[in-house]
């Protein structure tokens, strides 16, 4: 098969693919595959985005940059778009994060920040028990995993620093259409009292009613978590929820 025949076969994978996918598609040896990939790179039909990932165009020199979510899926095959990136995708925040946040239960030596094809990726490794509530969306020919809206909120309650702070969670709770029963179920499934405390406090502040279903023991209330762990440990104590409200009083003005 000549290089143009190989190109047509590869185009069936879409405009971005991995070397592993190409080998499975073409059914050839690594040596043969490397030969054709290098030939197509020289002719301008392919562009190497990073090790093992290529973009393709049927017009030489016209390869495009893949969608950041698609690239994130290829970089972290066992992951899902999450936190601030998922908040933005669902329209739960007007903020546009400069970094794509990917959650994965698979421990690997990921760098703190990956920069690939001019895009920034932050990989957050969580325990397998916290990796649930995953949906699938289609972008071009690719399916991409993303946390569903309720899991996105719960993850942001768990790690507010990956969503722009607790204020972004408050905005999302106020403006988004959410299944509150599922939201509470997910919060309980996280096995984190801090998540339940933050959810209860914010729900009470917005009058959502979720707070009425949250049960905390006296011991839970005497062990104080920070409302926003991304901010300094200061501020008044809330004994109803066992929280230290470490945000200024005018913090809520733009929302309420």
Give the residues covered by each predicted segment:
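Short beta-edge/loop segments at beta->alpha junctions of small alpha/beta modules
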Residues: 1-78, 177-193
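N-proximal short alpha-helices
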Residues: 6, 13, 56-59, 122-127, ...
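Hydrophobic alpha-helical interaction segments
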Residues: 134-256
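A residue-level signal for conserved active-site and pocket-lining positions in enzyme catalytic cores
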Residues: 22, 86, 153
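Residue-level marker of positions within ordered structural domains that often coincide
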Residues: 27, 91-92, 158, 204
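Phosphate-binding glycine-rich loops and adjacent basic patches that engage nucleotide phosphates
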Residues: 1-3, 30, 43-52, 112-119, ...
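Short gly/ser-rich loop at a beta-strand->alpha-helix junction or flexible surface loop bordering the NTP-binding
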Residues: 19, 38, 43, 48-61, ...
């Amino acid at each position: 098969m000549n290089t143009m025949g190989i190109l047509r076969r590869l185009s069936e994978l879409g405009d971005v693919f991995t070397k592993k996918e190409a080998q499975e598609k073409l059914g050839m040896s690594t040596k043969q595959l490397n030969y054709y990939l290098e030939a197509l790179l020289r002719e301008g039909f392919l562009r190497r985005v990073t090790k093992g990932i290529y973009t393709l165009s049927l017009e030489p020199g016209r390869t495009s940059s893949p969608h950041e979510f698609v690239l994130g899926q290829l970089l972290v095959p066992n992951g899902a778009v999450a936190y601030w990136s998922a908040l933005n995708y669902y329209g739960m925040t007007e903020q546009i994060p400069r970094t794509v946040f990917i959650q994965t239960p698979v421990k690997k030596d990921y760098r703190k920040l990956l920069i690939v094809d001019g895009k920034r990726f932050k990989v957050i490794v969580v325990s397998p028990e916290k990796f649930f509530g995953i949906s699938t969306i289609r972008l071009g020919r690719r399916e991409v995993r993303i946390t569903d809206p309720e899991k996105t909120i719960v993850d942001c309650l768990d790690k507010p620093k990956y969503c722009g702070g607790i204020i972004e969670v408050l905005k999302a709770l106020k403006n988004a259409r959410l299944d509150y029963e599922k939201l509470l179920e997910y919060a309980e499934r996280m096995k984190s009292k801090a998540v339940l405390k933050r959810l209860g406090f914010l729900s009470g502040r917005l009058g959502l009613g979720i707070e009425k279903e949250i049960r905390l023991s006296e011991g839970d209330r005497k062990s104080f978590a920070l409302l926003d762990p991304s901010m300094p440990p200061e501020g008044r104590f809330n004994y109803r929820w066992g929280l230290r409200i470490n945000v200024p009083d005018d913090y809520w003005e733009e929302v309420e």
